[in-house]
Amino acid sequence: PSASFHPRPTAVGGATSCTNVAHLRLVDTNVLVYRFDPRDPVKQRRATVLLEAGLQERTLRLAHQSIVEFVAVTTRPLKDLGGRTLMTVDEALFEAENLLRQWDVIYPTREVLSTAMRGMSHYRLPWFDAQIWAIAEVFGLRELLSEDFQHGRHYGRVRAVDPFLDTPGVHELPALY
């Protein structure tokens, strides 16, 4: 059985313009994967609650890259699961279709790629992390929900937030422009 969310009343196709983005946040791949990963029930619950609320409130966005990575990660054999995968290929593709149907997905542009190169150099981000950050930076999303960045740090105009930390409040770090 699918762990999909209930479809929203109106689907949005293609890229979003991201107007009025002050309250919008970008979700990294790890949040999507934890929703289907039984190895950490606490993170699984947090990811589910976060995604359900974001879908209902329409405050979260996905990068096209996160959907691609989601399929790759959930179908990769894992040593600690005895070589099993989190999902079969068919299950992962079904969930990827649900993500495309239910969420506003942002696609890369030339500006995103140029910004990612700058982020890779300036912040010493790995290439794929730089691309996720660049989507948020270029499209004006103020927060990036991910455990792969330094929690509370500003990368340009984007603040990284680790939704899986057990710390009360948000600890802000100064912007490093």
Model-assigned labels for residue ranges:
Residues 13, 19-20, 102-145:
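Active-site neighborhoods of divalent-metal-dependent phosphate/nucleic-acid chemistry enzymes
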Residues 61-65, 145-146:
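Short beta-strand segments at enzyme active-site cores
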Residues 95-98, 102-110, 114, 151-177:
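Short acidic, glycine/proline-enriched helix-loop-strand junctions
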Residues 74-108:
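Helix-adjacent hinge/juxtasegments
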